A protein has these predicted regions:
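Bacterial N-terminal signal peptides
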Residues: 7-16
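Positively charged n-region of N-terminal signal peptides that target proteins for export
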Residues: 1-4
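Predominantly soluble domains enriched in secretory-pathway, periplasmic, or organellar proteins
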Residues: 18-392
């Protein structure tokens, strides 16, 4: 009897072990935002496959994603103010809150313990515990002259020194929030930086915060190594120019590419990629391209740029050689190419083709398509390797 019971127990334990999900890493995982259905697809780059779909994430029409340091969790910032923590291994929502009424992006702190969200409504930044999503801090933006609303906040990035840096669209400011001493941040405000900063980036070395201006030409630059020097205007010609050309889609400043000591910048309203000396911030060239560029994405080795475009040229992607500035490929993946993402080592390029209802995987060296995955109105593609890139 005892022997039978022990045998039964051993078999049960063995079957239980077999039924468990096998251990795996998350370094080759990512997500595709399905904007029309409020869902994410969890993707695996090694096998060019979609592993699961996570639903119930709200309005993802302008969604962005950051990742925990262990690359297990994706934090999804929805346009409806939703902040969702998604477990990539179990393919489920770990936690979800509604923290505002209209949000435009977020960031994760240098130590991975804080999540910041920038809000249009109510204007400001809220900061949360990355593990529990409990609110840590509320940073209201500057009141507008009517004293009823606060400025909308854009261009939120993480910066070295446990800081978040962001821009105030309506009041023309850049703020830095330093959390290095605890949950009450030290706020540094820079006013009069220019009209209507609409988006921003931080350079890969974490030194310069660059805000694009919608209300005038030029960019506002804050040297985070020397904030006491204040904000200065650079790239005075960058913008729509005196002709005020129609802009079908403002370029994303995350779409700047840094390669070979140059910055490759999507021009505003012009069919050009601008080339800047990244030490002196002076223009050195302008590359003619097929349309108004939205993203200019560098292959991790810096040798190639992949460029997508605003309507009506958003069915095309052009590839530029960063040494010769020549266009080496003119691809037509399909209607409405919205986003592009390289894998961490640059062996694959993933494209979202919204109106084609698919995500494509390309070999960027041979310029050949490797795979196609169905998706529901796909937009942003984000790999978990972003967890270890400042500003991402």
């Amino acid at each position: 009897m005892i022997r039978s019971l022990l045998s039964f127990t051993a078999i049960a334990m063995l079957l239980s072990a077999c039924a468990q999900t096998p251990l795996r890493g998350t370094g080759d995982l990512g997500v595709v935002v399905e904007r029309a259905t409020g869902s994410l697809q969890i993707i695996e780059s090694d096998t060019h496959t979609a592993l699961a779909r996570v639903e119930g994430l709200g309005d993802l029409s302008h969604a962005s994603v950051v990742f925990s340091r262990d690359q297990r969790y994706a934090y999804v910032f929805g346009r409806d103010g939703g902040l969702s923590k998604v477990d990539l291994l179990s393919a489920r929502i770990d936690r979800r809150i509604i923290q505002g009424g209209n949000s435009i992006g977020g960031a994760i702190s240098q130590d991975g313990k804080l999540i910041a969200v920038s809000n249009y409504e109510p204007g400001g930044v809220k900061v949360f515990n990355a593990r529990t999503l409990e609110q840590i801090a509320d940073i209201p933006a500057t009141l507008l002259p009517d004293r009823q609303k606060r400025s909308r906040v854009v261009g939120l990035v993480d910066a070295p020194g446990q800081r978040f840096v962001f821009s105030l669209f309506d009041t023309g400011e850049i703020w830095s929030a330093d959390f290095s001493q605890g949950p009450t941040p030290r706020i540094e405000r820079f006013t009069g930086i220019g009209q209507q900063p609409y988006d921003a980036l931080i350079t890969p070395d974490g030194r310069y915060y660059m805000a694009g201006l919608f209300g005038e030409d030029g960019m506002a630059q804050l040297d985070l190594w020397h904030p006491e020097r204040g904000v200065k205007r650079v790239l005075g010609h960058y913008g729509r120019g005196q002709a005020r050309l129609p802009v079908y889609k403002m370029p994303h400043l995350e779409g700047w590419a840094m390669a070979d000591r140059h910055a490759f910048v999507p021009a505003v309203g012009h069919h050009q990629v601008l080339v800047m000396d990244a030490r002196r911030w002076q223009p050195v060239d302008a590359i003619a391209v097929a349309g108004q560029p939205v993203f200019v994405t560098a292959r991790p080795d810096g040798r190639q740029l992949w460029v997508n475009f605003a309507y009506p040229d958003n069915d095309r992607v052009q590839v530029i050689d960063t040494q010769t500035h020549a266009i080496v490929a003119d691809l037509k993946p399909g209607p409405a190419v919205l986003h592009m993402e390289f894998t961490a080592r640059g062996d694959q390029m993933w494209l979202s083709v919204r109106d084609g209802g698919e995500v494509q995987v390309w070999d960027p060296y041979r310029l050949e398509r490797l795979a196609t995955l169905p998706a529901q109105s796909p937009s942003g593609i984000f790999f978990s390797s972003r967890a270890h890139k400042p500003g991402y």
